[in-house]
Amino acid sequence: MNPTVEVKVPDIGDFKNILVIEVLVKPGDTVSAEDSLVTLESDKATMDIPAPSAGVVKTISLKPGDKVSMGTLILTLEAPGAAAPAVQPASPAPAAAKLATPAPAAPGPAAAPKSDIKADIHAEVVVLGAGPGGYTAAFRAADLGKKVVLIERYPSLGGVCLNVGCIPSKALLHMAKVITEADEAAHAGITFGKPKIEIDKLRAWKDGVLGKLTKGLSGLAKQRKVKVITGRGEFTSANTIRVETAEGTKTVAFDSCIIAAGSSVAKIPGFPYEDPRIIDSTGALKLATVPKRMLIIGGGIIGLEMATVYDALGSKITVVELMDGLIPGADKDVVRPLAKRIEKRYEKILLKTKVAKIEAQKDGLKVTFEGPNGTTTDIFDAALMAVGRRPNGRELKAEAAGVTVNERGYIPVDKQQRTNVPHIYAIGDVCGEPMLAHKATHEAKIAAEVIAGHKAFFDAKTIPSVAYTDPEIAWMGLTETQAQAQGIEYDKAVFPWAASGRALATGRDEGLTKALFDKKSRRLLGAAMVGVNAGELIAEAVLALEMGADATDISLTIHPHPTLSETLFFAAEMAEGSITDLYVPKK
């Protein structure tokens, strides 16, 4: 009889309770090594757990909606030969601060002497990828006296964030806010006519914003004498990269390299992606048209931000999410005000529901749902795929340089951003979650400074997250869900924005500010906010946590009044028992 292998969730750092969004196999299925078994979902990305070896699935211990941690049994596999080793981590999981990525098992090749390298161009530092992390690394290295080459496959610097992500989405979200605020001013006696949306002008304005920023980056590169090469780069050795450019192939040699290759949109297999009515976030930001009925597949940050834009522009929105709540990375009480608002604005919000099939028809996209009410169908004019992103680590031929890339495309690094090859570093999306531009830029400066001989390493206590929805949601440090899962004793203070003079004056009092404090030390553990401009407010909480502030420190810091920023101050006063703006009965 063939041995039975227990396949368990690998090391995913300190974070627990990762959600299972799909089980991809069933008992009796034959799988090959590296076939995906289950899909897990974090804040902004999905991760698959692969089979450690070929075999036949005997039993399955998980179902969609379950929460798992390291060591949770996924399934048993009947496989020939000895039991396979545990699978390696699909990716580092998001947590209050950056999670430790698995250290490479063995060092890679050392840098070759300069005299042995034949190349068209030689640089002390090559940066592969020019997103927020890449250009920051290049500019910082140049400022520290290094000769730098920056390789980018697209014509414009800035990567996904600037060109097809953070910046264009915020431009459109701003205009969406203008539309909705004008519409909702009627309750105060100010009535505007229905807005006329000139889609071509709106698109041109958005593109103009991007143009200013990309032009600015090009200027900054020239000022620093950073050589920019436009083309697709791949490693050919531990000291060389081949770049396919419009003028031909160029070989670039380097003493040190920083990989900043980013990530790509994840897709659910089996859908007719050749149909232009199925779009991803990049397609949604092109603003080709405003569909009458739009399906958002994925109730995370990216999907809900795009839903906010298209709802304001006039689309009837349906959101479908496999889990039992929106924005899985945030606490449910923080998401609730957003959920209540969009329930009134959107056509449908389908939770615990799977998109089983999409059929391209002449009159629209016929979508089959499987959910609590059984199997249903509906017709949409467009469907936005927003189920996360995948790292680009496997697109670089990193193996030619000896760089370790795990099965999901992540490149493990240490706290100085080093890969297993000592002179090659990795930053941003490609080296682990959370996939956020501000994480990438922080890592970029660390890598550049280490290369320049500085004593730098990643020691940030938290990486804040923001959903730029309406209302916005922001959180940092430990969430309450994480604190409970880790058995941490804490005190919670929640200040409702209904008691905030500024929130009431703006007509948006549905928000709240929540702060968690360590029960013994009284230091801030985490904070979350939902409400107008929550993304602008969370930075104070980040600074407080980084500085080791406790409830007393925050409550004794004089805040301007009336502001939304004082809601964190009020939450700290609630924790201290000194608040006068609310009556809190003594315990």
Residue ranges with predicted function:
Residues 1-39, 48, 52-54, 58-61, ...:
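Acidic, low-complexity mobile loops and tails
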Residues 25-26, 31-32, 51-52, 62-63, ...:
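Surface-exposed strand-loop junctions at beta-sheet edges and helix termini
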Residues 32-50, 69-84:
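Short hydrophobic beta/alpha edge segments that flank linear recognition/processing sites
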Residues 92, 98-113, 117-126, 139-146, ...:
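Glycine-rich flavin
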Residues 125-150, 303-312:
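N-terminal Rossmann-like FAD-binding beta1-loop-alpha1 element of flavoenzymes
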Residues 129-133, 155, 297-300, 330, ...:
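Glycine-rich Rossmann-fold phosphate-binding loop(s) that bind the pyrophosphate
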Residues 137, 142-154, 160, 167, ...:
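Flexible, glycine-rich terminal cap/loop adjacent to redox cofactors
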Residues 274-291, 376-451, 536, 544:
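FAD-site-proximal beta/loop scaffold in flavoenzymes
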